[in-house]
Amino acid sequence: MHTFENHTPMMKQYLKIKAENPDVLLFYRMGDFYELFYDDAKKAAELLDISLTKRGQSAGQPVPMAGVPYHAIEGYLAKLVHLGESVAICEQVGEPVIAKGPVERQVVRIVTPGTVSDEALLPEKQDNLIATIYQEKTQFGLAVLDMTSGCFQISELQDAASLQAELQRIQPVELLYSEALEDKHLIEQFKGLRRRPLWEFELSTAIQLLNRQFGTKDLRGFGVEKAVLGLCAAGCLLQYAKETQRTALPHIQSISLLQNSDTVQIDASTRRNLELTQNLAGGTENTLAAILDKCVTPMGSRLLKRWIHQPIRNIEKLQCRQQHIQMLLQQNLVEELQPLLRQVGDMERILARVALRSARPRDLTRLRTALEQIPFIQHQLTKIPHFVAFSQQIADFSVQLALLQRAIIDNPPLLIRDGGVIAEGYNEELDEWRSLSEGATRYLKDLEQRERANTGIDTLKIGFNAVHGYYIQISQGQAHKAPLHYVRRQTLKNAERYIIPELKTYEEKVLKAKGASLALEKQLYDEIFDQLLPHLGDLQLASLTLAELDVLTNLAERAETLNYVQPQFSTQIGLQIMQGRHPVVEQVLKDPFIANPVELNQKRHLLIITGPNMGGKSTYMRQTALITLMAYIGSFVPAESAVIGPIDRIFTRIGASDDLASGRSTFMVEMTEMANILHQATEQSLVLIDEIGRGTSTYDGLSLAWACAEQLAQKIRSLTLFATHYFELTVLPEKIDGIHNVHLDAIEHNDNIAFMHSIQEGAASKSYGLAVAALAGVPQNVIKSAKQKLKQLETLSQQNSCQSQSVLTQVQGELTLMEEEENTSAVIETLKTLDPNELSPKQALECLYQLKKMLN
């Protein structure tokens, strides 16, 4: 902690501002640089790979310093934000000329990973979300804000697993949490963690803040008033957003409650295994989003990814999306609309910057271009009756368009402070000041020629810099010829600089004109915001509508290009997919993809899948999940036909990985995921199980796999694909209704194997493990030895087939016995609660039947 005594006036000012912003890096404007001092300088030097120097002394100690040029700040901010750091931007707000002591400075904004709106700092095709968590006992409130669109949502989660799944879905770049949060291990993997005091989560404060933001008396109109934990989180989040932006947030105009029942639930493991927007290596190649996303606007790409991560269960909405896609294809409007939509660009984020008054001149020209496309887009939409509602959501912006066309030049400078942004003819006073300022060039050329002639100095020239203003420069070799009325202003190595009364007078006149011109231009620029902001709500609705139109047009193009079909929805539980294909694998393969059917229903709800490694079991399972998910975002699907029943959740238990950081083995991770499925799945869930029970002994693994399959088939009755190498499980269809065997085919000839990748009814005859090992390049001597050992084991197996059968019977018996014990204990507990003296004969008979039923 630095005290202010004995420091220079400038360092006192710095330390005072730093004390007000202790938890962020302070970028302190000094001339053409942003400087950092003390610990901030050391940290920035390390993170940004810039030089760490010293700035003289203050209070008797050298001051560590690092700095970046003001014109290059965006690149450095982008790097810091990506690393999860926050930065306070401290600007000079006073005039250096009239300042007594240090120029007045103040923090104008705080840039944090989750509240940035600058185009250079944002990932173009990904949402940039900030979230807040509030915990009470085992329940959580979650608030999520997209500062770049104003979308504000809350939800309430009943347990840690649900919270993890939701955080995995939204992937916040900044995460606020209460200092009272107990389960901190849930958030340790996220960057941009911010610990907040408990008082910021008070419900009464939250309600007051939200009502003030939306201009309402209560929150009933938003349907969030009963979500107490979510509101507590929202209050903290809104307060933080206001603190960092240092301005009003007019683009945040509503708040909504996200209900789990509205969406198909997908847990963190399933998102990872299905590679929706990120592959298993952490990249974006060969993901579902990479195949589906050919949107022509960044806001369309972001919306499509939201749909992928949050499939909806509202069949009416889904069928509406399907109809829109069908109409776009029938009317051949994809090629007409996409060039127009491409010109709309990222209207959503531009409007956020308009709301925050941080929009740059080129943002306004892009907004102008977007508004110019709207009449043409609406004209195309009138060709389709189904799109009337779309067209009605886009208001008439002809007044706002005319304003931007009159006010802003075609190719403005990057920043308003550079001047020359407002178009000629927009404001008469501005035009007058500019003519005075621009007349300086001609005057100075005339003066330079006149002075050369008067003095006979051919190296004489007139120049200007920000520190010394206008000057006459003469080379050192001719400086002795300077007239007596030339007053020396600056000495350089090779030249002398002078001022004369005439030039000084003109300088004051020109600087006044330039200053007045810039000041008026900034004022006019701010007035443009004043004229746009009353229409912000309509503009935001239009941008959201255009983003959705982009997604639907994109899905129509994908359906046509990739030969997708419209799936049908059924009220009957089940899936019937004819000749389904994996949407990603079919695009990556050089050879034609082998399509396969899937049939799951209430009489056929668990498929035991056997077959060789590399045979296509995992691909078959994943494609079933992806086709189902695509149907639930409203997309067409890769199949000949598809009928999809109600789905509430999609679960996967695929692949093997350990969690060394948490001290969990591969088997422990596998069992944790399996436990989650067994606790959460319902008869409307789609469950994919790939090789359960491999990480332990054979009998342990077989017992667990058997018991899990039995539970899923008999108790839960979920729609399940169950891949296994335990051939013992192929007898399950004989014992339990609803279980069926299927296998992936392969042909072996002369030690060579050909995978047919075709799904067939019945169990596989063998696993072809040695053939796959040979394909993988295992040395031939090892393969030969393995074949000999296999023959020995097969002979031994035939001799002990009775013993093997007894082991299998024992596994069944133990599981049945455990179930019988559970039933018996339930009967005993019921009997303990009965008093025979209080039962009528009829009640006693009913109890007897009930107990008999429990035992059976």
Swiss-Prot record:
InterPro entries: DNA_mismatch_repair_MutS, DNA_mismatch_repair_MutS-lik_N, DNA_mismatch_repair_MutS/MSH, DNA_mismatch_repair_MutS_C, DNA_mismatch_repair_MutS_clamp, DNA_mismatch_repair_MutS_core, DNA_mismatch_repair_MutS_N, DNA_mismatch_repair_MutS_sf. Keywords: ATP-binding, DNA damage, DNA repair, DNA-binding, Nucleotide-binding. GO terms for molecular function: ATP binding; ATP-dependent DNA damage sensor activity; damaged DNA binding; mismatched DNA binding. One of its GO terms (cellular component) is cytosol. ATP binds at G611, P612, N613, M614, G615, G616, K617, S618. This protein is involved in the repair of mismatches in DNA. It is possible that it carries out the mismatch recognition step. This protein has a weak ATPase activity. This is DNA mismatch repair protein MutS. The gene is mutS.
